[in-house]
Structures are given as structure tokens and as C-alpha cells.
Amino acid sequence: MKLTCMMIVAVLFLTAWTFVTADDSGNGMEILFPKAGHEMENLEVSNRVKPCRKEGQLCDPIFQNCCRGWNCVLFCV
């Protein structure tokens, strides 16, 4: 019984801790992972827009690198 109560308290504590420490800002990952040194030195390169894939081209489902309006399912469709 004591072990069960301790487990419940631990789970509640960890859940509360997760919500308290969560970063709710829109650019949280940008703050956690600052730009690489070479991007900071050459701002023109870092601000360049990366090319997108057009309809029918191979794409990366993880990064969703298709142009706007297209969905990535191995190919931009």
C-alpha cells in the first residue's frame, strides 16, 4: 500500500514537473539549439531560403521539404 502511494505521488510530481518546465514559446527549439558558428559568421547563407521539392520529385517525409500546397509521401503529391 505504501509503495503504491509512493508511486502515485512520484508520477504526479513528475507530471507536474514536466508541465512547469515545458517551453511554450513558438521558437523554443531555436533558443535551445542556437545557430552553428559558420551560420553566425555568414548571415547571408543562414538567411537563404532552402529550395523546396516540386510535384513528383522525391521528398523527405520527416522534414516535409515539398513546396507549399504539396504533401510528402516519398514523392511530393
UniProtKB/Swiss-Prot annotation:
UniProt keyword list: Disulfide bond, Ion channel impairing toxin, Knottin, Neurotoxin, Secreted, Signal, Toxin, Voltage-gated sodium channel impairing toxin
A GO term, aspect molecular function: sodium channel inhibitor activity
S-S bridge residues: C52-C67, C59-C72, C66-C76
InterPro entries linked to this entry: Conotoxin (IPR004214), Conotoxin_d-typ_CS (IPR012322)
Family (UniProt): Belongs to the conotoxin O1 superfamily.
The record's note on its domains: The presence of a 'disulfide through disulfide knot' structurally defines this protein as a knottin.
Protein function: Delta-conotoxins bind to site 6 of voltage-gated sodium channels (Nav) and inhibit the inactivation process. This toxin shows weak activity on rNav1.2/SCN2A (EC(50)=2.5 uM) and rNav1.4/SCN4A (EC(50)=4.8 uM). In vivo, injection of this peptide in the head region of garden snail induces retraction of the head and body into shell. This is followed by secretion of viscous green slime and a convulsive undulation into and out of the shell. No apparent biological activity was observed when a much greater dose of peptide was injected intraperitoneally into mice.
Record-given protein name: Delta-conotoxin GmVIA
